[in-house]
Amino acid sequence: FLEGRFSEEQMDNFRREVDGGGLSSYPHPWLMPDYWQFPTVSMGLGPIQAIYQAHVMRYLSARGLVARGDRKVWAFLGDGECDEPESLGAISLAGREQLENLIFVVNCNLQRLDGPVRGNGKIMQELEGVFRGAGWNVIKVVWGRHWDRLIEKDTTGLLIKRMDEVCDGELQNYKFNGGAYPREHFFGKYPELLELVADMTDEQIMYLNRGGHDPYKVYAAYAEATAHKGQPTVILAHTVKGYGLGGAGEAANDTHSVKKLDIDSLRGFRDRFGIPIADDQLEKVPYYRPAEDSPEIEYMRRRRASLGGSLPARKADFNAMQTPPLKTFAKQLESSGEREISTTMAFVRVLSTLIKDKSIGSSIVPIVPDEARTFGMEGMFRQLGIYTSEGQKYVPHDHQQIMYYKEDKKGVILEEGINEAGAMSAWLALATAYSTSSCPMIPFYIFYSMFGFQRIGDLAWAAGDSQARGFLIGATAGRTTLNGEGLQHQDGHSHILANTIPNCRSYDAAYSYELA
């Protein structure tokens, strides 16, 4: 809105579906195709997508398909969101692959919807340990610069000790109850600390800020993160939920439910942040935007221009691919004669044909979650190589065989291990590379059909929202293929799940020629 990208009419339509004229409260590329790049709902989908977007960017550059450059993937998430398995489940990949092009910013306001994230503990320390253990560079932005004078003044070390020992539930209390409460309960534990703030008013104590609300500290963290090499970075920023709302909801458990501020709360918010709106205008709750020639707007526009334009911004311009002629699949269109073959085997043959095609072969990416041998794809290991940023530091035991396990810095296959969510996220990153990198790819994710939509349905819905372009192959499908392995291997319903996604076309091929 301040940049001029959103009109007042659009702002009026926030959280309203108005035939393309509304603003969705969550990121949805389908609803705002020129604006949002990534759908980050449900919770946890943003972090895992960010990891694999960064991973795929490195993959594409390793293969020489895009320039490596200095692009960064930024993911903004909450401390409560980190309890979602998808939020932290893939961070070891980022550390292992040394994805220095990835930055997480975790808004640690210490609260979930219902209550504290770790009322009896300290979520920032917990997350620090998890990320450090996974090989990440961790930057903590805990206390704002208004604390600096007190820290310098404290010669006993008690202030730092008190900061470290207090639990998150109490930190929430300090902001909710006002300056007198932290004077008594935070500083009051040690007489030396009470003396430290004896010359401060309760209001001054109340405005001892947290690091995530201090632009100087945040800038320093961002500068360090963008310059760091050899590791992904996570910034843990200490904030207050409902910051600025005062008694209307600051640090309150019901902040999320506050839909409208009364006149006194509006006046308090205006005064706190110095917004130039007169008393007689407050009840109308007008939008405030500085004039076009104001220093603020001119500065903002200069900075955005120097940084390459506004964010977010989604682009969908790319060069169209040339579809291979039908004769390319001549062998798959012929009868197999007396020999019966599975559609899974037929797919592998189709894939081999496509990879050899001169026009689109380099765009084909097979993705497997530790099932290549199950599907008879191991012949591609040596032919294409399995991508890894480290290459192959060991001699595989089967290196003298034709189909040995070959890892390569320029490998084509993405072998994601026993990790359907990761494999689907890699597929999603490649299936949207036409938009994110102006590099259209054709990813084929092949999986046990029962562990496809049933396992990663949320990511499949996100793929539809993202307008992803690629192929999902549910192999060994059917209720009779793997009866002996039990109910979890008897899939006769994947198409029902696939059909819930409007822009996902599903096929149930019975013969090789249909598949081709």
Residue ranges and their predicted role:
Residues 226, 259-263, 267-270, 275-279, ...:
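Internal gly/pro-rich beta-alpha loop/helix module
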Residues 37-39, 66-84, 102-104, 364, ...:
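A short, small-residue-rich loop immediately preceding and capping a beta-strand
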Residues 76, 81-85, 103-105, 109-420, ...:
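Conserved acidic/glycine
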Residues 6-16, 95-107, 128-138, 461-479:
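A glycine-rich helix N-cap at a beta->alpha junction
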Residues 57-67, 431-452, 511-513:
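Glycine-rich phosphate/pyrophosphate-binding loops
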Residues 1-97, 121, 377-380, 387, ...:
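Cofactor-binding active-site loop characterized by glycine-rich and histidine/acidic residues
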Residues 260, 393-403, 459-473, 484-498:
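Flexible glycine/proline-rich, aromatic-decorated loop/lid segments
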Residues 73, 78, 86-90, 104, ...:
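Extended, hydrophobic alpha-helical segments in both membrane/secreted and soluble proteins
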